[in-house]
Design a protein with these regions (language model features):
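C-terminal transmembrane helical hairpin of 12-TM major facilitator-type secondary transporters
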Residues: 274-317
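Helix-to-loop junctions at the C-terminal end of transmembrane segments
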Residues: 38-54, 151, 259-275
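Juxtamembrane intracellular "pre-TM" segments in multi-pass secondary transporters
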Residues: 184-213, 237
């Protein structure tokens, strides 16, 4: 849900309402956030090896979501400060600010996925992960609807209230979700995992793993390229208010959730995973072409349909 505020509201406000250059917005909200993903693999290994207070995952998750929430609550003030004086020094400081948010987000996310692995058997892991992703889509849809209703009329004070409330709600839900999920252990021995270098070497030596990693990287990068620019695109090209562009996340979430359900329940049993993933990629390509066409036609109806189609393709992928 926090991603809706960060990548669905803040990026649009920074560009359209505050007038920051889109390159700066992309650098801060896009690069700053997603560069945090670089810590995911080494941090997962780090949390395997080191407990905090007897916990291998819980403390890392709480620390990550706390830092993320704090930065999100402060981000409207940082955005306005930067808009008043977008000097290279200020842009650099803001980049570090948003990079910390990205690192904290991926620290919490990596530890949470590791906790799921710890709590489930190999047979349970697939359904559990699928349920988590489905509920995440539900959270995006609900947050998108709620944020759009709250931002019907944009003011800076309303934006601050929205971001502060969202941060507090996310922290509260995280604490509730984590309650008694991990037992505290201090001295219990735990099997030592392979070193990070050895794990990466194993990945590099496997042709199948290399090809899959490259495919996944290219596919995810291609899909997430729209994350930073979609809402500013709706605001500048179509003249849509913040409430309407915030709903883009709802349309996308409906498409992704529908694609996951359609693929998992209907298509994969009949066509296989490779064909369904390929179908999802072609749908994403068609959706991006539709986004381009909608810009020339200035049709908001085509735009909404195309965003939903983009989510459907991503869900199948």
């Amino acid at each position: 849900g926090l991603s809706v505020l960060f990548l669905g509201v803040l990026n649009r406000i920074m560009r359209v309402e505050l007038g920051l250059d889109l390159l700066v917005v992309g650098l801060l909200v896009g690069a700053g956030h997603y560069l945090g993903a670089l810590v995911a693999i080494p941090f997962g290994y780090f949390s395997d090896m080191r407990r905090i207070g007897g916990y291998r995952r819980t403390v890392y998750i709480v620390l990550g979501i706390t830092v993320t929430g704090l930065i999100l609550a402060l981000s409207p003030w940082v955005a306005r400060w930067l808009a008043l004086a977008p000097t290279p020094l200020h842009v650099s400081a803001a980049f570090v600010f948003f990079l910390i948010e990205g690192i904290a987000t991926f620290v919490a996310g990596t530890a949470y996925l590791a906790l799921i692995t710890d709590r489930t058997s190999p047979e349970e892991r697939g359904p559990a992960t699928g349920l988590v992703w489905t509920l995440m889509m539900v959270g995006i849809i609900v947050t998108g609807v709620g944020a759009a209703m709250f931002m019907r009329t944009y003011t800076f004070d309303r934006m601050v209230t929205l971001f502060t409330t969202g941060s507090a709600a996310a922290l509260l839900l995280a604490v509730i979700a984590l309650w008694q999920q991990e037992k505290r252990r201090h001295a219990e021995p735990y099997p030592q995992p392979a070193s990070l270098h050895a794990a990466l070497g194993l990945l590099a030596r496997s042709q199948h793993s290399r090809r899959f990693a490259i495919f996944l990287m290219v596919g995810m990068c291609s899909y997430f390229m729209q994350d930073v620019i979609l809402e500013p695109f709706g605001g500048e090209v179509f003249g849509l208010p913040p409430a309407e562009t915030t709903r883009f996340n709802t349309y996308m979430g409906v498409g992704v959730g529908g694609g996951m359900l359609l693929g998992g329940m209907r298509l994969i049993p009949h066509l296989g995973k490779r064909r369904v993933a390929g179908l999802g990629c072609w749908i994403v390509v068609a959706a991006f072409a539709g986004l381009t066409a909608s810009g020339f036609s200035h049709s908001a109806r085509i735009l909404v349909s195309t965003i939903t189609l983009l989510g459907l393709g991503a869900g199948l992928f």
